[in-house]
Amino acid sequence: MRFLGDYKFALLTCSVIALSIYFAINVEFRFAYDSPGTRTGVKVSEKSPFDDEFMYMSIAEDIDRSYLHYDYYRESCPTAEKIIAKAIRDIYNVTPSVAPPIIRLLFHDCFIEGCDASVLLDADEAHTSEKDASPNLSLKGFDVIDAVKSELENVCPGVVSCADLLVLAAREAVLVAGGPFYPLETGRKDSAAAYRDFAEHELPAPDATLSVILQRFSFRGFNERETVSLFGAHSIGITHCTFFKNRLYNFSATGKPDPELNPGFLQELKTKCPFSVSTSSPSAPPDIGLPPSLPASDSENSYGMSSGNRNDEVIDLSYNNEGGDENFGTRYFRRLMQNKGLMSSDQQLMGSEVTEMWVRAYASDPLLFRREFAMSMMKLSSYNVLTGPLGQVRTSCSKALPRN
């Protein structure tokens, strides 16, 4: 089928239309929410990262330079995205807890040297693995990715990269968890190396200060607004008592609870997480990262995603799907406003004028949050990607192809 001429012109036309819609949404978005006297009751002064012409043009230039585009596998593997979406949904129907680990895998991959599937590589005689970095020891869902990759290889051997597979699987995980859809370009290539040392030091810890978190996101091009929106993924998944017990019993080595914790919530948590003499600050991140992770139990799990220490109580971050799927994200921000954030790094979002502003905005306007979260996930999923000859397409996501 021809459209306004040949295929290349059609692709350019579609790209311009998509960018125009994307920009128009943000103009409407700015008009509705970034003016004084908003529905959120917050006077917004920070500019959207998409507000000015320079950013709009830079997005267009990036598309011109990039090998990424929509429907990249249209000819080489036309059913690729459908296969990935169906596989994640089929697994979700059996194991609903599959979504948070896949979303967390995406973050832990993209945050370290970009979205190149390096987090999926196993160690071998010559290379270390990011899986062995302490922040990644609780990562789950590798077997889910392997299962989907196997399906793709049966249909289109050696075509779909693990990096594309992971970003598309994470998008489907967001959808089944009640989050928004967002369009993704494809054409990423896989890294031939892993970056364990970077993963060890760059992934934010659960007790990281707000300044450290914002600095690490800023280094990767995310402003406060986008960073806060990504934290909304903490409205699903689980975390272990081990990783916040110090807030209940020995905050900052005072022998007392964190004074910022809501008193009623504190008592609720103490009931679920009784005191033990080993209570101290965790040395590794919890099963909730940015985004969160891990199924709440192994009883419904057919993919080996064990919940770590079975003797350690866990907290359901959705609080039994409080408010329903339509409150994906917003329930998290509302609880922060009530001083009911589990991690210090969560509650600290209320400790800065700018981040608090966005917490309140997202808590009061689910549509605003869903738009912002979708845009931030698009940005995260395209961070520092490998394209063209810079990467490879692995046939097994855990093993790099031999270098020529």
From Swiss-Prot:
Pfam family, one: peroxidase
A single MF term (Gene Ontology): lactoperoxidase activity
Positions of Ca(2+) 1 binding: 109, 112, 114, 116, 118
Residues bearing attached sugar chains per UniProt: 136, 250
Coiled coil, from the record: none
Active-site residue numbers: 108 (proton acceptor)
GO cellular component: extracellular region
Protein purpose: Removal of H(2)O(2), oxidation of toxic reductants, biosynthesis and degradation of lignin, suberization, auxin catabolism, response to environmental stresses such as wounding, pathogen attack and oxidative stress. These functions might be dependent on each isozyme/isoform in each plant tissue.
Name this polypeptide is given: Putative Peroxidase 48
Lineage: Eukaryota, Viridiplantae, Streptophyta, Embryophyta, Tracheophyta
Gene this protein is translated from: PER48
